[in-house]
Amino acid sequence: MRRPALWSRVRSTGPAAALVLALAGPGIAVPSSAVAAPAAPITPTAVSASVSVDAGRALATVPATGVGMNVAVYDGNMNHPSVPGLLKDAGTGAVRYPGGSYADGYHWQTHTVEGGYVAPGTEFDAFMGTVRTVGAQPIITANYGSGTPEEAAGWVRYANVTKGYGVKYWEIGNEVYGNGLYGATWETDHHASKTATTYATNLVRYAAAMKAVDPSIRIGAVLTTPGAWPDGITGTGDPADWNHTVLSIAGAKIDFVVVHHYPIGNSQADLLGKPQAEIPGMAATLRSLIDRYAGGNAPNVGIAVTEVNANAYKNTSPNGLFAPDEYLTWMENGAFTVDWWNLHNGTDCTHVTTVEGAKDYDDGGILSSGASCEPALNTPFPPYWGTRMITKLGAPGDVLVRAAGSTPAVSAHAVRRAGGDLAVMLVNKDPAADATVTLSYAGFTPSSATPTVFSYRKNATSIGSTTTGTATRQTVPAYSVVVVQLRPAR
């Protein structure tokens, strides 16, 4: 059983304690969970890998909302003038609001959080201004813990009728299973009953009230992440575990399911193997549950992964490699959005370490909050650059196709692009040795021209590009992400 982990984010029934720190200014965050010890030094050895790409075997279409980001109303810099450009350049197609566990205490009409700090300039309309500038879609988490169906329906009316924002995706609550039902409490929930049965019953009421205002919206149900605590545990008062109970009651009334993924990596290598080791099984389990309980509507019920991040190495190169692997593996397995936690998260500067020659501030943000120990506000951390590499691989509407590698040390993703081009992402997970990668293709014959190659290298602060190698042989630097762009033979 996986223990309930308290990440560097707001996950408390007493959010005031966490966010009193935010009142002190940028760079203050909730104390973090334990961080895995640095990996032992690795003696460089040659890495050789083969990667086969089947351009005719489609896995998924790159969704417009695939690359997502979380923002939180306690972040006074969430709408900073630099933010829209940074998000747009990273290919951000979805932005989630009002911020994790804060959602279950957030009242949109008064722009307040029960017991919590709300930064000036983070109102819903200001958020929507940023989202529209980015060209992304909002994902809204309605207040289940201390709200009502009527309050949520009022938000839909304001957003989509009064303002015409066209907000499509609405989650009902955040990590509601953390309400004490299973013995751990980090999520606000004022309902007398904390059972999955109660949540599902109320979820149906929320869906009815909100869709009465705008039938075109999509409603998401909070599920536990398959294989992670408390998945599989039957709580007191429920007939089955959380997921089976919720979907048996509400499965026919929802449009997507919601999970979060914070893999626990006990070393750098362990973390970097998690996307391939965990995501396919999780996604298959979710799809099986949907097929079982959603009836004839099952093909239309999506999977939303509305929070992801690593549990360690947050601001250093391992997380820069983890990010694109995480996003793309979820998309390949059917998720329509994968949302990084968080835009800015902050740090108290008490857990600064050195990882692969760079400072790690234990800050869960993808951009610096500008704390005293950190680089300037909005400086991108490695996960930002790793995520931005996805824009070199493909765009919404392109097709993710099968790419298989011969060794876990090098992961691969491929996209068949509009117009017939192909792009391949290679992630070298060895921190010390370059990888020589031999590539082969089915359903695509590459041009003999030297390909364009984009790269994000260890501890770099930008993405580089060059023409190098061939379509069938590339050298991938240690701890780097490269994208090889190929044209078809004419």
Which stretches of residues belong to each language-model region?
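Aromatic/acidic polysaccharide-binding cleft in carbohydrate-active enzymes
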Residues: 305, 310-388, 392, 398-411
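C-terminal beta-strand-rich structural cap/linker in extracellular carbohydrate-active enzymes
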Residues: 467-490
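Solvent-exposed beta-hairpin/edge-strand motifs
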Residues: 442-461
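Flexible loop/turn segments at secondary-structure boundaries
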Residues: 75-78, 102-106, 147-148, 177-179, ...
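Carbohydrate-binding surface patches
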Residues: 406-445
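Secretory targeting and sorting signals
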Residues: 2-38
